[in-house]
Amino acid sequence: MTFVYRYYDQAELERQLNARATVPDITPILARYASESARMRARLPCRLSVSYGASEPERLDIFPVATRGPASIFVFLHGGYWRLLDSADSCFMAECFTKAGVCVVAVNYALAPLVTLAEMVRQCRAAIAWVHAHARDFGGDPTRIHVSGSSAGGHLAAMMLAPGWQADFGVPDNLIAGATLLSGLYDLEPVRLGHPNEWLKLGAADVAALSPLLHMPEHAVPLVVSYAPSETHEFKRQSEAYMAAAMALGCPVRFVPLPSTSHYDIVFGLAERESPLAHAVIETMGLA
């Protein structure tokens, strides 16, 4: 047996990276992303397809709240293994958070193979910088931006916590006030060695530049972290490794166990005010 990463041979590595195989059928879950998000757009005040960059995919959807003062902002970066989904599938939590007095922003970004992962990270940073610059236009507080993402979005959200990019975008180093990371990938070396690299085309330099575990936050950012019980060992290991590294740096980390969830439906806990996940996030934002 030849190990290609840690103690995985190639076949086992592919199994570890195959999140889709952990659920019987992904189709109804994806349909629920779309239908629940459409319901939010139909029933809540919102500003849709607001441009934050030069290309068509660089747009975001905003769900403001009517508050007396500037509100916290929950920014969501969708998953899809960096090649699927859209902001239109990603605002299912809007009612839960706006009822709690939190503005919601669902970010769209270009996908592989149209763009590189480095460009996706750049676009998400541009979106966060846009939110910071325009927050007061929709009742948001630019000092209380909480970023969140699931799966590939968890990776992208963690890259928003990395140091070294903020000056290029004209934002403060401590821009992010908190983060929620769900079932993310934070070490891209196994991704480079596995089937996702068919569309990502990562090289060793990309792994070094774009792995959140190699670019941990320099500020003590409060984190909420979770993953589903049915995740593969590698997905669980990566979340555990990121949490350990963050705690070692002084970040307050709250792990939320979520029984009876999967890699794909774990995000719906953000849409249910009484769920442990939504409660933890809102409490971390100082609003519970």
PLM-predicted stretches and their roles:
Residues 1-288:
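Alpha/beta-hydrolase superfamily serine-hydrolase fold, recognizing
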